[in-house]
């Protein structure tokens, strides 16, 4: 009898607690529709069920805020200004938003759970962002670990991007086997050496990532990306490979891909100052876009140089393009430094890391490096080394432009 009474009492307590929780939830959490007031413009504002993240709500209503990490809170790009509602800023946002910015209402849309009516402000250019379903034209190796993905924009459509801009590419849940990758024989040596074909990428959720465009605005009808495969580091061989890079490497001509854009902040300044471009690896993409735009579209007479770091001749690409630009433009010079040239390369050019080569062979004897504009994109270690070198030369932050795809 005591056991039965105990079970009954326990059940009643659980039921009572459940009722209390549901009652509290009904009072504290808005489970009905809420209103998102955008820029105090009724045509841009909308109503939606409460509970989702602000980034997702905006996207579902055709407003695409930049989010290079796909809403994971790590890139800090999906900034919005919240005037009313939104609650307190979260610890996950504080590494991207300063105290001053937080006081002004700056938040990360991917971290804001919408539980009440909001009043927000968005830059006007966001409303020019669109989605397109593109078709893969080609997806070819340009280096051992870098593919050039070329996409066809739908007929009659235009992606109104600026040189240095980027798009976001979407992937549905998928499984990718590296053994199915089409890697030309000339690049297979390192793939076999490090047993990379054994990897698989299994993704259960839709994914979004950002990539800088390698084409420039007058290369119409296409989007061109340089994508480096993100394999697990040798020190952590059991780590999962890169989600989006694995997906992109699996794409074949004729496949359909959804992109959104354009986005960007890595734009050239409209001045007459000398431009120095510094790149490495897949950081080639915005370098190519910028340099082609300056010389082929704008016919710039600014002094321009491009310094690119690669491991060996096999990792160099777009050589003919830049050689031709150099031959056609007296104001442009480009230089490559190989950090690990192979015997078969018969390399007679610069060797070493690109920041050292740039310093020793150009900037050290430059009359005023602090007056130049520096545009860079490459691996994080390269970026850090270049920035330190430039700071040591007295270059101010305002003249150092970085496309920080490596975080």
Curated annotation (Swiss-Prot):
It holds the Pfam family FAD_binding_6. Its main location: membrane. Binds 1 [2Fe-2S] cluster. [2Fe-2S] cluster binds at residues 69, 75, 78, 110. Its cofactor is [2Fe-2S] cluster; FAD. SUPFAM superfamilies: 2Fe-2S ferredoxin-like (SSF54292), Ferredoxin reductase-like, C-terminal NADP-linked domain (SSF52343), Riboflavin synthase domain-like (SSF63380). Residues 32-126 form the 2Fe-2S ferredoxin-type domain. NCBIfam families: nqrF. PANTHER family: NA(+)-TRANSLOCATING NADH-QUINONE REDUCTASE SUBUNIT, NAD(P)H-FLAVIN REDUCTASE. This is Na(+)-translocating NADH-quinone reductase subunit F. The gene is nqrF.
């Amino acid at each position: 009898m005591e056991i039965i009474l105990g079970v009954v009492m326990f059940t009643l307590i659980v039921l009572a607690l459940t009722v209390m929780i549901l009652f509290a939830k009904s009072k504290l959490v808005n489970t009905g529709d809420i209103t998102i007031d955008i820029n105090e413009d009724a045509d841009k504002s909308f109503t939606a069920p409460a509970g989702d993240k602000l980034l997702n709500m905006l996207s579902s209503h055709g407003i695409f805020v930049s989010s290079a990490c796909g809403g994971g809170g790590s890139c800090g790009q999906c900034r919005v200004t919240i005037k009313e509602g939104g609650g307190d800023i979260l610890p996950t946002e504080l590494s991207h938003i300063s105290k001053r910015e937080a006081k002004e209402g700056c938040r990360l849309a991917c971290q804001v759970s919408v539980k009440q009516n909001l009043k927000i402000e968005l830059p006007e250019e966001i409303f020019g962002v669109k989605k397109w379903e593109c078709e893969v034209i080609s997806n070819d190796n340009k280096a051992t670990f870098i593919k050039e993905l070329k996409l066809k924009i739908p007929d009659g459509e235009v992606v109104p991007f600026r040189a240095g801009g980027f798009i976001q590419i979407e992937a549905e849940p998928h499984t990718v086997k590296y053994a199915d990758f089409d890697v030309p024989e000339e690049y297979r040596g390192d793939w076999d050496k490090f047993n990379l074909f054994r990897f698989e990428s299994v993704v259960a959720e839709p994914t979004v990532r950002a990539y800088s465009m390698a084409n420039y605005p007058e290369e119409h009808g296409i989007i061109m990306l340089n994508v480096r495969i993100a394999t697990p580091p040798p020190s952590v061989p059991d780590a999962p490979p890169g989600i989006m890079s694995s997906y992109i490497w699996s794409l074949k001509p004729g496949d359909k891909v959804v992109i959104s854009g354009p986005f960007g902040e890595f734009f050239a300044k409209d001045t007459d100052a000398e431009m120095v471009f510094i790149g490495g690896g897949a950081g080639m993409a915005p370098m190519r876009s910028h340099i082609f735009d300056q010389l082929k579209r704008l016919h710039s007479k600014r002094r321009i140089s491009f310094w690119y770091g690669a491991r060996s001749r096999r990792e160099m690409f777009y050589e003919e393009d830049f050689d031709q630009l150099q031959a056609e433009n007296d104001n442009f010079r480009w230089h490559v430094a190989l950090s690990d040239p192979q015997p078969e390369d018969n390399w007679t050019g610069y060797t070493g890391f690109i920041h050292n080569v740039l310093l020793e062979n150009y900037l050290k004897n430059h009359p005023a490096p602090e007056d130049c504009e520096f545009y860079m994109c490459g691996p994080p270690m390269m970026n850090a080394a270049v920035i330190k070198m430039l700071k040591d030369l007295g270059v101010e932050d305002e003249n150092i432009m970085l496309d920080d795809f490596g975080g």
